[in-house]
C-alpha cells in the first residue's frame, strides 16, 4: 500500500452544505477517493439525508465511503472541511452581492465547525469566497494557512481549457494562471503564460501569431464571466467546482506539495494586506505554506492592487 493510500483510508473530508455545489463536491471526492470518508452536513434534514443515501447506494463502486446528516457532529474530526453553505448566486448577481447575507451565516457557522474539528483545514467555496475567507479567519482566530478558499483555481482551469481550445493542443501543455478576486476583477498573468515553455504571445502557427492582444482580452473575459452564462442556463455551477474541490483535497491530504491558485489573507503582497485574493500558493498537509513570488509586470501589479481595493470596499461594507 502506498503512503497516499494509507493516508486516504484514514482521512476525512466534510462538506458543509448539501446544495448543488456541496453535493457535487461530495460526489467528486467520493468517486475520486480523495479521502477515506466523505461527510455531508446541512441543516435541511430531509435534503441532506436524501443526498447521503443517494451517494451511499453507489459506494460499492467507489474507493471511499460516505456519511452525513443534519447534526454538526457529523463533521467531527475532519481533516479538511469545505464550506459551500449560503445563499445561491442568482442570474444577474455578482458574487460580491452575496457578501452580507453569507457573512452572517459564516460568523455563526465557523465556531461550530472549529469546535468539532479543531485541527482541520477550512476551505471556503461559498461566494464571495475572498471576502468570506477574511470573515472566517476573523470568526475563528485561526492562522491564514488553515483558512482559505478555492479562489481562482476553477477560473484558471477555465482559462487553460479556453487556451487549449484556441491553440488546439493538449491541456497539460498549457501553463496560465488567473489571480486576484474570484470575480469580475480577476485577471490572467499573461506575462508568464506559456504553452510548453513558449510565451503565449509568441505562439504561432504557420508564422502567424495565434494569441493577439484582442484574442487574449476575449479569453480573459470569457474565463471571468463563464459562471454567469452557466447560471443563466441551468441555475448554478456545480460539476467543475466539485472537481476543483476534490483536487484541492488531494493536495491537502497527500504527501508532497502542489502549487495551486488559492485565495488566502495577504500580508504585504505588493503592499496588499488584510484582504484575501488568489495567487499561486504552495499547498501541503499544513495548508498554505506560502505564496509563490511569481513575476508580474507593472500592469499586472496595478490590476492586483485594484482587485484588492475592490475587496477592501466590500469588507468595509459588511464590517
UniProtKB/Swiss-Prot annotation:
The active site is at 182 (proton acceptor). Beta-D-fructose 1,6-bisphosphate binds at residues 160, 175. The keyword Protein transport does not apply. Allosterically activated by fructose 1,6-bisphosphate (FBP). Substrate binds at residues 89, 95, 127-130, 155-158, 237. It holds the Pfam family Ldh_1_C. NAD(+) binds at residues 21, 42, 47, 86-87, 108, 125-127, 150. The modification Phosphotyrosine is found at residue 228. HAMAP family: Lactate_dehydrog. Belongs to the LDH/MDH superfamily. LDH family. Catalyzes the conversion of lactate to pyruvate. Homotetramer. NCBIfam families: L-LDH-NAD. This is L-lactate dehydrogenase. It comes from Cutibacterium acnes (strain DSM 16379 / KPA171202) (Propionibacterium acnes).
Amino acid at each position: 500500500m502506498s503512503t497516499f493510500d494509507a493516508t486516504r483510508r484514514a482521512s476525512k473530508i466534510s462538506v458543509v452544505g448539501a446544495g448543488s455545489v456541496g453535493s457535487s463536491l461530495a460526489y467528486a471526492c467520493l468517486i475520486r477517493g480523495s479521502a477515506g470518508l466523505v461527510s455531508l452536513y446541512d441543516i435541511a434534514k430531509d435534503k441532506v439525508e436524501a443526498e447521503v443515501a443517494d451517494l451511499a447506494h453507489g459506494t460499492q463502486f467507489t474507493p471511499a465511503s460516505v456519511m452525513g446528516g443534519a447534526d454538526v457532529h457529523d463533521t467531527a474530526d475532519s481533516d479538511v472541511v469545505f464550506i459551500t453553505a449560503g445563499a445561491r448566486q442568482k442570474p444577474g448577481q455578482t458574487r460580491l452581492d452575496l457578501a452580507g447575507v453569507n457573512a452572517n451565516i459564516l460568523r455563526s457557522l465557523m465556531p461550530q465547525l472549529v469546535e468539532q474539528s479543531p485541527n482541520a483545514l477550512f476551505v471556503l467555496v461559498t461566494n464571495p469566497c475572498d471576502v468570506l475567507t477574511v470573515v472566517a479567519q476573523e470568526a475563528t482566530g485561526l492562522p491564514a494557512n488553515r483558512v482559505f478558499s478555492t479562489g481562482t483555481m476553477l477560473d484558471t482551469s477555465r482559462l487553460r481549457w479556453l487556451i487549449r481550445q484556441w491553440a488546439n493542443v493538449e491541456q497539460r501543455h498549457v501553463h496560465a494562471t488567473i489571480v486576484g478576486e474570484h470575480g469580475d476583477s480577476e485577471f490572467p498573468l499573461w506575462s508568464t503564460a506559456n504553452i510548453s515553455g513558449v510565451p503565449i504571445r509568441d505562439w504561432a502557427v504557420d508564422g502567424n501569431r495565434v494569441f493577439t492582444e484582442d484574442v487574449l482580452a476575449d479569453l480573459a473575459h470569457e474565463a471571468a464571466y463563464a459562471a454567469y452564462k452557466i447560471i443563466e442556463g441551468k441555475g448554478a455551477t456545480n460539476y467543475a467546482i466539485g472537481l476543483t474541490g476534490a483536487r484541492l483535497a488531494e493536495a491537502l491530504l497527500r504527501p508532497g506539495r502542489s502549487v495551486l491558485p488559492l485565495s488566502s489573507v495577504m500580508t504585504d503582497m505588493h503592499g496588499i494586506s488584510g484582504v484575501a485574493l488568489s495567487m499561486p500558493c504552495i499547498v501541503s498537509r499544513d495548508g498554505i505554506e506560502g505564496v509563490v513570488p511569481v513575476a508580474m509586470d507593472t500592469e499586472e501589479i496595478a490590476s492586483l492592487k485594484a482587485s484588492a481595493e475592490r475587496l477592501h470596499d466590500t469588507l468595509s461594507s459588511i464590517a
